């Protein structure tokens, strides 16, 4: 059977090789093709923008926003709307033409920079020749797409920071230059390995920028107990990562009799001081993104997707799914509003008022809010616990959750940890163990949740601070084990960021990425001692003796 598409950007790709007929995520071949075309023209735009800067000419910030938006829209489980994707291709072609007109030197521009299309049929035809498999060398292809997937994650973080008024020209310039370099056939494998690590370095900058944006706007996360039950009022469930969307929704629902609940990666919003004043901000409903087909059903009210992860909705609740920002799905209502613009949530609020209250699926509380500022405020307590031997090791279990049955490994691993270990987590991987009763060590909970996937930055800050406090030369001398779960491209930039900080001995699961060729995987093993996972029992024995 010939390939109708090829995509291998997520952990769940078929056979850990690639989706060739339809995406496990639900992406159809036409959608995959339009995403391929969009990435291709975005790389071309990056080439033109990079050359303009080299000529000393300014590149307008709206171009930066177009690039980050394009990259973000192609992240797994973000946008399934072919019309939106085709329109983004058109916008990018127009931007290329506009910028190219200002170039003094137009020689040697790539096809990606010069190709134009307005009809969807032309985009689909082009996609067949410019996707992943267009690069024939296994190792060059592997590195080009490792970099591209890392840039997608970086773009997501840059966009969230931009929404809150923070952006760095150097970050945008790097993203565009790196995209252009993935078109450059003169670059060797060694050049691309160096670019991969440079991508990680800028990934740290992107996460630091977003951390500053979030904490500067909403305060530093603090230890918080979050309700996981429900109230008697109708509600709106907000999923994704965009805190500005949440802020606007909370303001507009105040006094309406409609409660607001977080879902999946929105859970950490409860940790920010600025959101605690809203009495109708009730709690968190459900678990990680992949359980949404059951949980959106039982929530009963409308659901707002602000970013990934959206699973193609069932007909039974599709009319209750609203998208905004870069998210799109054909047939779902989209709430417009670009960066800096007001979003009108009156339609979803009116819809909520016609719905019954959420069906309770669990009750009780979970605790979180252990980002770097909060943990460093407890530094003396933590340091004393380490020095006394009460805490023997920390285990970083940040990252993503997913559908695979093999991910029960992380629950079993957490349950089997020695009682003198503390889990440091961020991202939706936490749902595999954040409701277990793992207790505490001298009042320090054994699961310290820093927040969303981007808050893996907090875990790096904590590690570097501990290195300083204990007077160590190398961050790898700390009593920290890294056992990270990945799913999509934001996890890729987190991994590259950790590597750029010199962190070694990271275990990545439940499988290593399909886009790592054997030789590229070998380089990562040799330089950073990256490994996979086996069984909970064997890994516990290997990590803790």
UniProtKB/Swiss-Prot annotation:
Keywords, ordered alphabetically: 4Fe-4S, Cytoplasm, Iron, Iron-sulfur, Metal-binding, Oxidoreductase
CDD domains tied to this protein: HCP
Cofactor binding, note field: Binds 1 spin-admixed [4Fe-4S] cluster.
Signal peptide region: none
GO cellular component annotations of the record: cytoplasm
Keyword flag 4Fe-4S: yes
Protein residues bound to hybrid [4Fe-2O-2S] cluster: 241, 265, 309, 400, 428, 453, 488, 490
Ligand binding ([4Fe-4S] cluster): 7, 10, 19, 25
Pfam families for this protein: Prismane (PF03063)
Superkingdom field: Bacteria
One term of GO molecular function: hydroxylamine reductase activity
Cofactor(s), by name: [4Fe-4S] cluster; hybrid [4Fe-2O-2S] cluster
Catalytic activity reported: A + NH4(+) + H2O = hydroxylamine + AH2 + H(+)
EC number: 1.7.99.1
Cross-referenced NCBIfam families: hybrid_clust, PRK05290.1
Family, similarity comment: Belongs to the HCP family.
Subunit and interaction comment: Monomer.
Full protein name: Hydroxylamine reductase
Origin species: Desulfovibrio desulfuricans (strain ATCC 27774 / DSM 6949 / MB)
């Amino acid at each position: 059977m010939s390939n109708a598409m090829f995509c291998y950007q997520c952990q769940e790709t078929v056979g850990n090789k690639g989706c060739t007929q339809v995406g496990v995520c639900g992406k159809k071949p036409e959608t995959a093709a339009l995403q391929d075309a969009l990435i291709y023209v975005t790389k071309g735009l990056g080439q033109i923008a990079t050359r303009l800067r080299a000529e000393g000419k300014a590149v307008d910030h709206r171009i930066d926003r177009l690039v980050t938006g394009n990259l973000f829209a192609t992240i797994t489980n973000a946008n399934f709307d072919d019309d939106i994707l085709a329109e983004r291709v058109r916008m990018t072609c127009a931007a290329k033409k506009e910028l190219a007109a200002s170039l003094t030197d137009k020689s040697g521009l790539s096809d990606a920079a010069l190709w134009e299309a307005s009809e969807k049929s032309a985009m689909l035809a082009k996609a067949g020749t410019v996707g992943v498999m267009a690069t024939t060398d296994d190792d060059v292809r592997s590195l080009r797409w490792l970099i591209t997937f890392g840039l997608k994650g970086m773009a997501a973080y840059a966009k969230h920071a931009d929404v809150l008024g923070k952006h760095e020209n150097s970050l945008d310039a790097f993203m565009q230059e790196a995209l252009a370099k993935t078109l450059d056939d003169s670059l060797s494998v060694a050049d691309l390995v160096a670019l991969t690590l440079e991508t990680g370095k800028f990934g740290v900058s992107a996460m630091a920028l977003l951390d500053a944006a979030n904490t500067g706007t909403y305060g530093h996360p603090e230890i918080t107990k979050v309700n996981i039950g429900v109230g008697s009022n109708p509600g709106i469930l907000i999923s994704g990562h965009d805190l500005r969307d949440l802020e606007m929704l909370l303001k507009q629902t105040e006094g309406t009799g409609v409660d607001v609940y977080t879902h999946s990666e929105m859970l950490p919003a409860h940790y920010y001081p600025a959101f605690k004043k809203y009495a109708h901000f009730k709690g968190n409903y459900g678990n990680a993104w992949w359980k949404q087909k059951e949980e959106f059903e039982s929530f009963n009210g409308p659901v707002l997707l602000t970013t990934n992860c959206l699973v193609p909705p069932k007909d039974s609740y599709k009319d209750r799914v609203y998208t905004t920002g870069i998210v799109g799905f054909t047939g779902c209502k989209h709430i417009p509003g670009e960066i800096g613009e007001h979003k009108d949530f009156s339609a979803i609020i009116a819809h909520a008022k016609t719905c019954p209250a959420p069906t309770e699926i669990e009750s009780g509380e979970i605790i979180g809010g252990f980002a770097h500022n909060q943990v460093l405020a407890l530094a003396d307590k933590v340091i004393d616990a380490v020095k006394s031997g009460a805490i023997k090791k920390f285990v970083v279990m940040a990252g993503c959750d997913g559908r695979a049955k093999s991910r029960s490994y992380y629950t079993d691993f957490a349950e089997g940890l020695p009682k003198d270990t503390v889990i440091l987590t961020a991202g939706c991987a936490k749902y595999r163990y954040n409701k277990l009763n793992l207790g505490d060590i001298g009042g320090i909970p054994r699961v310290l949740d820093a927040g969303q996937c981007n808050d893996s930055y907090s875990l790096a800050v904590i590690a570097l601070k501990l290195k300083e406090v204990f007077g160590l030369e190398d961050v790898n001398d700390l009593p920290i084990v890294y056992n990270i779960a990945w799913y999509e491209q934001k996890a890729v930039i987190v991994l590259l960021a950790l590597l750029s900080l010199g962190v070694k001995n990271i275990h990545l699961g439940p499988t290593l990425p399909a886009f790592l060729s054997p030789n590229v995987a070998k380089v990562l093993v040799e330089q950073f001692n990256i490994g996979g996972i086996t069984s909970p029992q064997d890994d516990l024995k290997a990590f803790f003796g």
